[in-house]
A protein has these predicted regions:
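Gram-negative and organellar
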Residues: 27-425
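Bacterial N-terminal signal peptides that target proteins for export
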Residues: 2-12
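Bacterial N-terminal signal peptides
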Residues: 11-22
Length: 425
């Protein structure tokens, strides 16, 4: 894992070099932004244990620096936010780190590249759909470093038609021994082709190499084919076939997943959007014990006068080998979630999120179910132009067939923050 730390430092240096070289080469609009946040955090069950709970209060201070640069054909973004965290339980301090860097450039009328790196050193689990990270809440508090790198190149060879080459790399490295560290490599290729104004298609392939410390290493091949038809400017229908093959380097049983679906993407009104996809997934194990699952996706978004409401429901098969928890593998699951964001007053914004998810794990010796309920609520008040005060509450209840995996956790956050532009040139 020491080599990965060197690569992270090298990646950050490359980004800074690209930023300053690009800024000097052409006329760019640059902004330096600074901020700071003060926080109090209460956690009722830091180790996500159903017995012998440990509670903790922490106090944190986190300065931040953001550097933005934009030009006619390229954009740079760099943000770094270290955090000094004091634990009232252990009377110790730690320093967290969060870094995000992006560089995209249009080299010609047809060629564009993207380079992005995200680094995080912390204890809390977190999810980020944009970079494809989901470290499960059930991990509890474990000190770790996580780095995610993405590089891609697109070539537009015709109207609404392109070829995309990509490479993604993720590294999870825990400070304590015995955790499921991993290195994940994923090169990929995607083709989007517009046949005519009504018909278009997408085909993609990705190979994933997973190198784990505690679990079996794996090789994964994943391919998808989509066919789209535009019924109208506001309505699109499509069909999809997907295939995934996983080969383990160890006693874990290899498997294939076949998925066939059809769907609808429609703007019901200027403020309402509906996405619907349904079909079936088939889980085929080399050692027998095949299973099938309903594949379903529903998303409804409604723009309110002063807010946004979203509702989603989904079911299918979920591959969780890279969740930072051992003995996860493939689960058959279903989930519902509702989110409401509302501007309550001129300077007061509220948020409420509720979700329920149920998993049946198919690769464990005895199939086990886990049921998770989550709620997340916050109020944010803006004042004095640059300042914001936020109070947030989260609750997680995990009810598992295996009693040792059951727990509930309450968290309360109080955050005072400010951010403003310091310099423009």
């Amino acid at each position: 894992m020491h080599k990965t730390k060197m690569l992270r430092c090298l990646g950050s240096g490359v980004f800074l070099g690209l930023f300053f070289a690009g800024s000097a080469a052409v006329a760019m609009e640059n902004t330096l932004r600074g901020g700071i946040s003060l926080g109090q955090d209460y956690d009722s069950n830091i180790y996500r244990d159903n017995q012998g709970r440990e509670t903790e209060w922490t106090t944190s201070i986190s300065p931040s620096m953001t550097l933005l640069s934009s030009g006619p054909r390229e954009n740079y973004f760099f943000r770094y936010a270290p955090g000094l965290v004091y634990s009232h339980r252990t009377d110790n301090e730690r320093i967290d780190h969060a870094l995000l860097a992006k560089f995209d450039k249009k080299w010609t009328e047809h060629v564009r590249t993207l380079l992005q790196d995200s680094f995080r050193r912390a204890e809390d689990p977190y999810e980020d759909a944009e970079i494809g990270v989901r470290l499960r809440d059930s991990r509890g508090r474990n000190r770790y470093s996580h780095n995610s790198l993405l590089a891609s190149m697109e070539y537009d060879y015709a109207q609404a038609s392109l070829v995309r080459l990509s490479y993604a790399n993720q590294v999870l490295d825990h400070s304590e021994a015995g955790q499921d560290d991993f290195v994940k490599h994923t090169p990929g290729l995607a083709l989007t082709h517009r046949f005519n104004p009504q018909w278009s298609g997408v085909a993609d392939y990705a190979y994933t190499k997973g190198d784990f410390d505690a679990s079996d290493d794996l090789d994964q091949h994943a391919a998808n084919a989509y066919l789209y038809y535009n019924l109208s400017p506001s309505t699109k229908i499509f069909g999809r076939y997907g295939y995934t093959e996983v080969d383990y380097d160890g006693p874990s049983v290899d498997y294939d997943i076949h998925t066939a679906t059809a769907g609808l993407d429609r703007a019901l009104s200027p403020t309402t959007a509906l996405f619907l996809e349904g079909g079936g997934s088939f889980f085929v194990r080399d050692a027998g014990g095949d299973r099938d699952s309903l594949y379903f996706r529903l998303s409804l978004k409604e723009e309110l006068q002063r807010g946004l409401f979203t509702f989603s429901a989904e079911s299918g098969l979920d591959e969780q080998q890279f969740s930072g928890v051992t003995d996860q593998g493939v689960s058959r699951y279903w989930k519902v979630k509702g989110d409401l964001r509302q501007q309550l007053l001129k300077d007061l914004q509220g948020m409420l999120s509720l979700s329920y998810r149920e998993d049946t794990y198919l690769e464990r010796v005895i199939g086990e179910d886990e049921r998770e309920f989550r709620t997340d609520a916050s109020l944010s008040y803006a004042f004095w132009q640059y300042y914001q005060a936020t109070v947030r509450y989260t609750y997680v209840n995990m009810d598992a067939d295996l009693a040792a995996n059951s727990y509930d956790d309450n968290r309360v956050f109080f955050i005072l923050s400010t951010e403003r532009d310091l310099l423009k040139w």
